[in-house]
Swiss-Prot record:
SMART domains per record: CYCLIN, Cyclin_C
Disease link: Ciliary dyskinesia, primary, 29: A disorder characterized by abnormalities of motile cilia. Respiratory infections leading to chronic inflammation and bronchiectasis are recurrent, due to defects in the respiratory cilia. CILD29 patients do not exhibit situs inversus, a congenital abnormality in which visceral organs are opposite to their normal positions (situs solitus) due to lateral transposition.
Protein's organism: Homo sapiens
GO cellular component terms, semicolon-separated: centriolar satellite; cyclin-dependent protein kinase holoenzyme complex; cytoplasm; microtubule organizing center; nucleolus; nucleus
Species lineage: Eukaryota, Metazoa, Chordata, Craniata, Vertebrata
Tissue: Present in respiratory cells (at protein level).
One Pfam family hit: Cyclin_N
Modified residues (Phosphoserine): 81
Name by which UniProt lists this protein: Cyclin-O
Function as written in the Swiss-Prot or TrEMBL entry: Specifically required for generation of multiciliated cells, possibly by promoting a cell cycle state compatible with centriole amplification and maturation. Acts downstream of MCIDAS to promote mother centriole amplification and maturation in preparation for apical docking.
Amino acid sequence: MVTPCPTSPSSPAARAGRRDNDQNLRAPVKKSRRPRLRRKQPLHPLNPCPLPGDSGICDLFESPSSGSDGAESPSAARGGSPLPGPAQPVAQLDLQTFRDYGQSCYAFRKAQESHFHPREALARQPQVTAESRCKLLSWLIPVHRQFGLSFESLCLTVNTLDRFLTTTPVAADCFQLLGVTSLLIACKQVEVHPPRVKQLLALCCGAFSRQQLCNLECIVLHKLHFTLGAPTISFFLEHFTHARVEAGQAEASEALEAQALARGVAELSLADYAFTSYSPSLLAICCLALADRMLRVSRPVDLRLGDHPEAALEDCMGKLQLLVAINSTSLTHMLPVQICEKCSLPPSSK
């Protein structure tokens, strides 16, 4: 009997045998019939309206159109058409999440507040003044609305801007670039679809290059030591709104209307350098209390929720009342129509 020679490991027969064995050992893989795509909600950018120049806050400029480099407008890039009115959709409350994590998150954010609060941001700025800061933020506010960004993004933008101003002198001709860079950094933290660099540069009418923006972004991140998650007015407004509803001090619809009005008041205060001395939690509770007063809420929010001195609360409330009185027309462009009617604000001119 002739003994067959052993098959060489590299022979075709051996390779075929290994393939058969491998196929027997592998588990069958069920292939998806259709590709799984992430569901995207439609985003509705807003068209900011020009406001009169006699208000205390600088005019909210119309969002500039695309530059000559052919960059598309924010509305087209985000896949939506502008809403007919200036109001954003009213948020919804998540009371179960608040019950589970609300107090822990509040205690953590409150402890961080002093570390992230920029004081005397313009003390080291020979070329940047409170007026130029007001003009820049009055331009950035409608830009953030045109992109359909959240109020949290705007608050983080202002915090990043002011904290950088406390560390580094900025030339006047680079101040606008710092503004859009701060907006980009904030949006990367919060937004699912942040604006593209090309879009932001187009808003500056081609005054800056992509390399300049990227270089300044690196400088800002290094100066701030990559600590970017600052507690904001937006966070504290949401916390106080949930707290009053959970405690049975207000109905959900009533609390949400007060929160929307308080956001409008807080948005006005962001552009005013006089309010940088107040912490975000103090501003949030005062804006909410003023909103309750304007809406004639039967059970206004308790000012003691924020654990602030009474003198500081009265001082901040007085300045906010004056701010709203001077900028009542500007405030109508930030609010839903039904809220303007309830608090007797002048109608928005379309």
